[in-house]
Regions:
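Catalytic glycan-binding domains that act on GlcNAc-containing polysaccharides
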Residues: 16-128
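Sec-dependent N-terminal signal peptides
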Residues: 3-13
Length: 128
């Protein structure tokens, strides 16, 4: 029984959600660290993490889309979206895959167009 408990405990401690630096890096890449009701992508994205309406809806987070102007709320939306579409990458703290899905949607990890974006996020997430 002790062996099972140790294996069970190890399984949960071996997994790591993405570091806080992941969100800081997303914020820097998306809006250079600006906050507030920033419109981007020709008015189709809102806030410091540049969230689209469909992304917000897919996240399942309650609240009006306009709340995406708030950084803390936006982080909750991004976390819920990524946990839904990339649960393994989320549990493993796979910044590269998470950035690609944030940028390119549910299939973003397989889109070449997301590679440069993910490289920027990964680079910035490793800075102190």
């Amino acid at each position: 029984m002790k062996a099972f408990a140790l294996i069970f405990a190890f399984a949960f401690t071996a997994q790591a959600d993405p570091p806080d630096s992941f969100f800081r890096a997303l914020h820097l890449v998306e809006t250079s660290g600006k906050t507030g009701p920033i419109l981007g992508d020709r008015g189709r994205a809102l806030g410091p993490l540049q969230i689209h309406r469909g992304y917000h809806k897919d996240s399942g987070i309650a609240g009006d889309y306009s709340r995406c102007s708030d950084l803390a709320y936006s982080r909750r939306v991004v976390a819920a979206y990524l946990k839904h579409y990339a649960p393994i990458a989320w549990r493993n703290g796979d910044v590269h895959t998470l950035a690609r899905i944030h940028n390119g949607g549910p299939n973003g990890a397989s889109k070449r167009a997301t590679l440069i974006y993910a490289a920027k996020v990964r680079l910035l997430s490793h800075r102190p």
